[in-house]
Amino acid sequence: AILHLLGCTDCHHENLIASRDQLLLIDTETLLEADLPDHIREADASNETVGPSKLQQRFQRSVLRSGLLPQWMFMGQAKRAIDISALGITPPASENQQQPGWLGINSDGMMPGRVSHRADVPTSLPVGIGAANPFPQYLDSFCSGFATQSEALIAQRERWLQPSSALNRFAGLQRRIVLRATRVYFALQRQQLEPAALRSPQAQALKLEQLARSFLLAETKPLHWPVFGSERRQMQQLDIPFFTHRIDGNALELDGKGTTLAGFIKTSGLQAARERLRSLNEEEIHFQMRLIRGTVQAKQLRVNSPLTKQDSSRSRSKQTDNVSTEQACQRIAEQLLNMAIRDPEGQVEWLGMDLGADGECF
């Protein structure tokens, strides 16, 4: 709950270590993450682009943003599903795993292939090789702890919002902001070092031109267009682009010379944390817990998952209930109404599960 309040966004398995009954955060660089506007949509001169709904915005700013909870990522052309979250990652099945490497090293027959490496055990889980991820077994305890922490934050709300509070000490401090996944920069960096890319400045420029493609979706020049120039200059030096901003500011620093891009940030990380604290109430706690339970349940589902005995017995018991069609429809309608989420403007939406890019995971 505290990580969610402070806007942490990078709680993958390498950034947390399980120690006894505690989960320790060892990389705090993404605390107090700022909220960014959709610069591409804002550059639409016709203003015909439909923005996210209230529920979608709420979902994007939810506890799921922390990266702590199970969530799928789909990698490569095969859309292979992987989970690198601290509480969702799966321990390796065996001590050794096959990975890309070199065969016949230091010989005339040296060639790329698959080699055996010792498997890395996730530090964020209290179990080792061959064990199942135990998090689903403790979901109720986790949700209970989340609710308890949230209630404690509500009790301390006024103290945290005071000008002399610990939260306010972050004002004026600099922090890094990651505008693209660093793996994108690393992939481009490898392309820059390929023989074909080293033959001319034009070949190098064509590799870096790929960074501009996301900006070209805008009808007019977007406000954050200077970001591309900064990315290009830094990658020409074979550096991974690095950007910073003040935790309580709305300007992005483009380089080490003090060049800034005003208005890049919609809501500063510090202001966003204050807003989350002010809006924290029983209904908000319940909403976040629904997301926590939903993401854990979705992680365990598969398109071709067989029905368990428990599921089959439930299905049979429902079929034998002596209810009329009208009563059954009424029950379904009541469930839909109970699960509905209403915003202040009266719009009604529902949370659901979506099929992943691999066509198998949810």
Feature map (PLM): residue ranges:
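Catalytic activation segment of kinase domains across protein kinase-like and atypical kinase folds
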Residues: 7-106
